[in-house]
UniProtKB/Swiss-Prot annotation:
SUPFAM superfamilies with a match to the protein in the record: Cell division protein MinE topological specificity domain (SSF55229)
Gene name in the database record: minE1
Pfam families assigned: MinE
UniProt similarity note: Belongs to the MinE family.
Segments traversing the membrane: none
Provenance organism: Syntrophomonas wolfei subsp. wolfei (strain DSM 2245B / Goettingen)
Example GO biological process: regulation of division septum assembly
Function: Prevents the cell division inhibition by proteins MinC and MinD at internal division sites while permitting inhibition at polar sites. This ensures cell division at the proper site by restricting the formation of a division septum at the midpoint of the long axis of the cell.
Stated name of the protein: Cell division topological specificity factor 1
NCBIfam families linked: minE
Length: 81
């Protein structure tokens, strides 16, 4: 987990790369995870990321459902240096 966070928040000269790194997709099997849990995950992910980097604008958050699976797709715009 720490390695993942180091890659996500590593110094980068490209704002586009940072935005791409922060596009998070969590997939789960709907039979074991409720919509309320997905909302909680979304809120907590945004909270954790905002502790480490400054967010610019409004994050785009989508819950995508396909068959038995759902995905939480988060696109977070970061403030430039």
């Amino acid at each position: 987990m720490l390695d993942f966070l180091k890659r996500v928040f590593a110094d980068s000269s490209s704002r586009k790369q940072a935005n791409d790194r922060l596009r998070v997709v969590l997939t789960h099997d709907r039979t074991g995870t409720s919509s309320r849990l997905m909302e909680t995950l979304k809120e907590e992910i945004l909270e954790v990321i905002s502790r480490h980097v400054e967010i610019e604008g409004r994050p785009e958050v989508k819950i995508i459902r396909e068959g038995r699976h759902s995905a939480l797709d988060i696109n977070i715009p970061l403030k430039g240096r």
